[in-house]
Amino acid sequence: MTAHVRERHTHCSLLWNTMRSTATTLLLVSTVNGLAIPSSPAEQTRRAITSIRSAILEPSDKPKRLFIDYLIPLPAETKEEDIDPWPGGLAQMYPYAEDIIRDILKGVVNEAGQCSSQVLSAPDCCGFFIQESQEDPKKDVAAILFPSVDQLDDIERIDEMVGPDRTLILMNKQFQRPADFGFTGMSKSRSKSAVFDRFKWGFAFQELACRGEDVKLTFEHPNWYSCAVCDEDVDLGSQQIKLLEPQLERPAYGALEAKINEVLPEPLWMRKMGEAKDKGLKFQR
């Protein structure tokens, strides 16, 4: 999915102890405010359903066109030494993602009935799902799984078929911006009008490396939340350090980096060095 990047002596020890106390305080604030990241696939699915339902019920922004970025859990057989946990790419992910999108759609739709599906593109591992509502056909929800730039025609066709009263979701899209459809020409312009100008976020759980830190972003309607996950201290365990305040727009990399510099002034490698000096090497404890 994504790779994580891991970025003299009395002075370092004092700084480390101070930061550890600060990190603990920030973690408590994060937990109290309910910003903790999903701790399991089941929790991620539950929170995705809640966020999407909230977005659908929002009276503005019709027709409902939503993005979902779901962090697909690694297969049970994954080992720590595996360089690529998904050597089969999207084809390997698809069965897991199919179960996930079915669970989400079933949870989003009131009185969920049958969920039908079809393959839009076998080479691109792209599928189409329709979750019917037994309460009202206008409450059916459709979803396209793993749409790529090659599915622009399909997105436009399905958007028209779904109509203005029903919701259409793009889950784990394989593009980020209009330029991905080409720097010039009609495809770029069409993608902007058909996708980027119409779709808004319904739910997201994303991870990225920022200044060598493991950063998690979540979107739960209507806000984006951000935190850094620090797990270099074995005794303290994994800590979620709140970064930016909840905001309507996805946090920019520069804003995240500036906040990390404020709350974690020492880079990861220096904190690990301080821990080793204070407590000894992990295998010696």
What residue ranges belong to the model's regions?
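Residue-level detector of flexible, active-site-proximal loop/helix-junction positions
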Residues: 75, 175, 248
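Ordered hydrophobic segments in well-structured contexts
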Residues: 65-69, 141-145, 167-170, 216, ...
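Redox- and metal-dependent alpha/beta enzyme cores, enriched for Fe-S-associated oxidoreductases
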Residues: 167-184
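Composition-driven, intrinsically disordered low-complexity tracts enriched in small residues
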Residues: 24, 265, 269, 273-276
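Positively charged, amphipathic N-terminal segments that serve as targeting/anchoring signals
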Residues: 35-157, 161-166, 178, 276-281
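C-terminal structured domains
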Residues: 259, 272-284
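A conserved mid-domain beta-alpha-beta active-site/ligand-binding segment of alpha/beta enzyme cores
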Residues: 179-265
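N-terminal chloroplast transit peptides
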Residues: 1-36
